[in-house]
Amino acid sequence: MIKNHFTFQKLNGITPYIWTIFFILPFYFIWKSSSTFVIIVGIILTLLFFSVYRFAFVSKGWTIYLWGFLLIGISTASITLFSYIYFAFFIAYFIGNIKERVPFHILYYVHLISAAVAANFSLVLKKEFFLTQIPFVVITLISAILLPFSIKSRKERERLEEKLEDANERIAELVKLEERQRIARDLHDTLGQKLSLIGLKSDLARKLIYKDPEQAARELKSVQQTARTSLNEVRKIVSSMKGIRLKDELINIKQILEAADIMFIYEEEKWPENISLLNENILSMCLKEAVTNVVKHSQAKTCRVDIQQLWKEVVITVSDDGTFKGEENSFSKGHGLLGMRERLEFANGSLHIDTENGTKLTMAIPNNSK
């Protein structure tokens, strides 16, 4: 199987293109040559190097060796002919982006040996132009030694972070699935029998309504009591779920509004204390839905959130300075507001909508649902 050793576009962005801008520098060294033939050869080698360099970054399989050795050969020739060692920076960066261990080490050591031999050859010949660059030559060789490992380490860390993020998302999905299955089991075990009982008693009351009205009334009263018990058990099950806290949701909506370039205004007052987890969870979901509507539909510049703890209820107000075209009745039926109203009414809460001077949603829910 042929493997991709690295992905140029995804992992590197425009960085290699920025590096390519520096292709002008080799021409300075080429013009220092006295021979026209050598100058022509130098120009060809420089243009060839950057062309190969681009292809090397999108190579895969065995071609990575072909382009890698060709780059090293051009760099070695440039050191020998023009005392230009700085192609080593480009090659070191290229090698550092190789994912696979074997080609990384092969090209790394071949590059180091060839660069060191070519530099030593120029040093032995005592080329004057090369000797004036000795401090920069040393820096370049040190970079050629360290840079590939530094880049490879950073790329490995980025890949591990991506894998970790994917794993966390998968775990979160599995947790949600397990939670759904648990809730389904609890609802089945808790409500299945009672709903069957309600159905049987309702059917019995229907048959007795003319024959024995008093017995039918008793059966209907029993149905009513069973329904209330079932509702309380549903609320207990929902309350036992891992809820969304209001403070966490405030952080989330702040990030959402900032990303949409909408000013978020919130002045923290006395935080609600006497509120059940179920009611807090319902308010958090409604708050998220309300802010999502602001971002998607209002074209607002500012969004204000107020949370008040009253004697009998907690009130959250979400207001914006956006515009809404249409009637309030049609507005209240769309944009997820029907679901918000149903959630709040489930906990004996309420939703009020005002579309004058922007949009204002007022959500109220009892301190403790009964």
Swiss-Prot record:
Give UniProt keywords alphabetically.
ATP-binding, Cell membrane, Kinase, Membrane, Nucleotide-binding, Phosphoprotein, Transferase, Transmembrane, Transmembrane helix, Two-component regulatory system
Q: Which residues lie on this side of the membrane: Extracellular?
A: 1-10, 58-70, 125-128
Q: List GO terms (cellular component aspect).
A: plasma membrane
Q: Which reaction does this chain catalyze?
A: ATP + protein L-histidine = ADP + protein N-phospho-L-histidine
Q: Where in the cell is it found?
A: Cell membrane
List the transmembrane segments. Answer: 11-31, 37-57, 71-91, 104-124, 129-149
EC number of this enzyme: 2.7.13.3
Fetch the CDD domains from UniProt: HATPase_UhpB-NarQ-NarX-like
Gene3D superfamilies with a match to the protein in the record: 1.20.5.1930, Histidine kinase-like ATPase, C-terminal domain (3.30.565.10)
The primary site where this protein sits is: membrane
- Histidine kinase domain: from which residue to which, for each copy? 186-369
The job of this chain, per UniProt, is described as: Member of the two-component regulatory system DesR/DesK, responsible for cold induction of the des gene coding for the Delta5 acyl-lipid desaturase. Acts as a sensor of the membrane fluidity. Probably activates DesR by phosphorylation.
Q: What is this protein called?
A: Sensor histidine kinase DesK
User: Could you tell me which species this protein originates from?
Assistant: Bacillus subtilis (strain 168)
